[in-house]
């Protein structure tokens, strides 16, 4: 059972790394006013983040966990990092869902990316989307980066726990 869970863990790490990269690419594209490329990058980031969540929960269900086994004086810092990661990850899911909802509303009203600015309901929805992602993107990046750091820490100072 554990080797399968370990493979799932590696796949989960790969998906969240790729999700973070796709997120950054999406931010770049929207700053270049490349809406279609932005949309594709963000959908990719969202799908990869969803896949990560499924893999992560599967790994936990299989009983594969790691705990910090490093120097005792570093444990408080590790726990602060871990708790902030967990809290921000919990906040990120609803933030991302609301941002996606406004995207859906805007696209439904506009009919296509080219009509976003011409259809008032679409413009309002995308203005709301923009307001939400100003919070969502930094939280998402924080969660991704702290997740990678936690993974690296546990790779060096982690011990596998089984249930």
Regions found by a protein language model. Give the residues of each.
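Alpha-helical membrane insertion/targeting regions
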Residues: 1-163
């Amino acid at each position: 059972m554990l080797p399968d869970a370990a493979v799932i863990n590696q796949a989960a790490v790969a998906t969240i790394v790729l999700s973070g990269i796709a997120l950054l690419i999406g931010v770049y594209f929207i700053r270049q006013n490349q809406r279609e490329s932005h949309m594709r990058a963000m959908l990719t980031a969202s799908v990869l983040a969803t896949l990560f969540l499924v893999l992560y929960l599967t790994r936990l269900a299989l009983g594969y966990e790691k705990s910090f086994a490093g120097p005792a004086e570093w444990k408080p810092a590790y726990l602060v990092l871990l708790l902030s990661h967990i809290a921000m990850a919990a906040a990120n899911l609803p933030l991302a869902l609301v941002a996606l909802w406004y995207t859906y509303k805007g696209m439904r009203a506009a009919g296509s990316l080219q009509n976003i600015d011409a259809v008032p309901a679409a413009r309002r929805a995308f203005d709301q989307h923009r307001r939400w992602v100003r919070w969502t993107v930094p939280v998402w990046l924080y969660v991704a980066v702290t997740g990678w750091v936690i993974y690296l820490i546990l790779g060096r100072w982690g011990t596998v726990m089984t249930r």
